[in-house]
Structure formats: structure tokens, C-alpha cells
């Protein structure tokens, strides 16, 4: 409606065979939690299909396009919302060039099967614009990240998760679940940050810090500088199936530093074992 289109009227009159839902107009960055509720409501009681489109632009130093785990996360969320289909909505899809590699064939093979996706590794992330993608002119179309982090002002982010982690934990299939929050320009030892998942404070006993200040890789210096706050989640802190809320609060900041802080990335990674008691490296280093 923002663009002046009467989509609901077209659907009711049977003029539309399907709606392809995207997180942006074109070249959208990775969004593993595209909300299909409005489209499902619009098409309820009609023959119009709801298809979930996935943009693979990641705009990050490590990966320019979505990893297989991100694709699986987005596909699983689409199926969980009863989408009629899920597809890659880019002009072309060659993450590692042409021809496709076995990694790509494995990634694409799973996206149509909720059963295969259920215990596929996932990488969920809050959509982030990143340094290479300009702001979106469409009202409401700009991604949630990055966001300025001010002292005492909580930031809350929605994170949609398709996994039934309680079920798979009980079956011995969950290897680990990790929540990562990347904050730019911050020095962790001089500033107090609190992270919550569904209003549950994640304690320092779960925290692993990753310093991105003056880090060099084979692809050049890591930027922007800052820290990643990574939490290894125990079962009683697992995200729930469906909507989750990640809250980031700067409790106290170093008064001697005037640089603005930003929440740059929010990621949740789920790693599965292929079956109970399965070790990925059964022989260890010696083998």
C-alpha cells in the first residue's frame, strides 16, 4: 500500500496467482526471519500462494553471500510459517562461482524439505545493512541493524527461530547453541554490557569475548573495530520456537571514550550432531 498498490483487492479478485515476499525491493541483505503474517492474512481463503524470497547479499568481509546455514535457517522459518514455497531471490546465484560446487548442491537440496531442515545446522541473524549497502528509501524498509547503543537505553531485536530445540536436546542431537552480539568501537573491559534473551539475563559464565580491534586476516584488516559478545547457551537458556527477543543494554560506558557504539550484528547459531554421541572428528588430531 505504501507504493500505491491494492494487492489485497487484486488477490480477492483472483488476479494474482502468488505473492513473493522479500525483505527489500532489490538486492536485499540476508534476513533469516522474514515475517509472512501479513501476506498470509491477505491471501487467507483464496488460491493465491505465498512464497518466501531470500536475498543472499551478506555485505561482510568473511562472506559476501549467505552461507548454507543461513539459507537453511531462512527456509526453515518460511516452512514454519506455512509458506507455499521458498526460493533464492537474486539475479543469479553463484556463491563460489560456476559450476556449482557440492556445497551448493547440498544447500539447495534441503530447502524444500522441512524434515531435512529440522536438524540441519542453522545460522539465524537479524537483518543488517552493513557498510556496502546504502539506506533504503522505502519507508519501513531499512534493516533493524546497525543501531546506536546509548547508555541506559535498551535495544530490542526480534529473532525468529524455527528449531524445536527442547525436542532435539532431549534426543541428544544438539551440539551447541550460540548467541553473538557484535558491538562496534567498544572496549569490553571498560564498558558494562548486558544481553538478554527473552528477558533472561545471560551471565558472564556463558560469555566468550572476541576482540576485533587491530585484527588482520588474509582478506585485510577487520572492520569496524569492536567486540563480539558470544554466549554459549545451556538448555535452560535456549531460544523458543517462533519469535524471540534479544535485548542489549549498555549499563555503564567509559566516560573517557567519545566514540559512538553501535550494535552491528546479532546472530544465533545452532549446531547439530548427525546422531546421538556423534563426534565430527572421531579420531582427533592423531587421525
Task: Report each predicted region and the residues it spans.
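Substrate-binding cleft of secreted/luminal carbohydrate-active enzymes
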Residues: 18-29, 54, 63-127
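Active-site clefts of carbohydrate-active enzymes
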Residues: 39-68
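Short edge beta-strand/loop segments characteristic of extracellular beta-sandwich folds
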Residues: 160-162, 178-184
Amino acid at each position: 500500500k505504501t507504493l500505491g498498490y491494492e494487492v489485497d483487492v487484486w488477490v480477492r479478485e483472483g488476479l494474482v496467482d502468488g505473492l513473493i515476499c522479500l525483505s527489500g525491493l532489490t538486492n536485499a541483505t540476508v534476513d533469516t526471519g522474514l515475517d509472512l503474517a501479513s501476506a498470509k492474512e491477505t491471501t487467507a481463503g483464496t488460491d493465491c500462494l505465498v512464497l518466501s524470497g531470500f536475498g543472499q547479499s551478506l555485505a561482510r568481509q568473511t562472506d559476501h553471500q549467505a552461507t548454507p546455514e543461513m539459507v537453511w535457517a531462512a527456509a526453515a522459518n518460511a516452512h514454519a510459517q506455512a509458506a507455499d514455497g521458498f526460493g533464492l531471490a537474486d539475479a543469479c546465484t553463484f556463491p563460489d562461482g560456476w559450476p556449482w560446487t557440492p556445497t551448493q548442491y547440498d544447500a539447495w537440496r534441503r530447502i524444500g524439505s522441512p524434515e531435512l531442515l529440522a536438524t540441519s545446522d542453522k545460522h539465524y541473524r537479524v537483518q543488517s545493512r552493513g557498510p556496502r549497502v546504502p539506506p533504503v528509501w522505502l519507508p519501513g524498509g531499512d534493516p533493524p541493524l546497525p543501531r546506536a547503543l546509548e547508555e541506559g537505553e535498551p535495544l530490542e531485536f526480534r529473532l525468529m527461530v524455527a528449531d524445536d530445540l527442547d525436542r532435539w536436546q532431549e534426543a541428544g542431537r544438539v551440539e551447541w547453541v550460540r548467541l553473538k552480539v557484535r558491538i562496534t568501537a567498544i572496549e569490553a573491559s571498560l564498558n558494562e554490557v548486558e544481553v538478554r534473551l527473552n528477558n533472561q539475563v545471560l551471565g558472564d559464565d556463558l560469555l566468550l569475548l572476541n576482540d576485533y580491534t587491530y585484527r588482520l586476516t588474509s582478506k585485510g584488516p577487520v572492520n569496524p573495530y569492536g567486540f563480539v559478545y558470544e554466549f554459549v547457551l545451556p538448555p535452560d537458556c535456549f531460544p523458543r520456537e517462533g519469535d524471540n527477543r534479544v535485548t542489549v543494554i549498555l549499563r555503564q560506558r567509559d566516560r573517557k571514550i567519545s566514540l559512538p557504539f553501535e550494535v552491528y550484528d546479532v546472530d544465533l547459531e545452532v549446531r547439530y550432531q548427525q546422531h546421538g554421541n556423534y563426534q565430527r572428528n572421531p579420531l582427533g588430531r592423531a587421525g
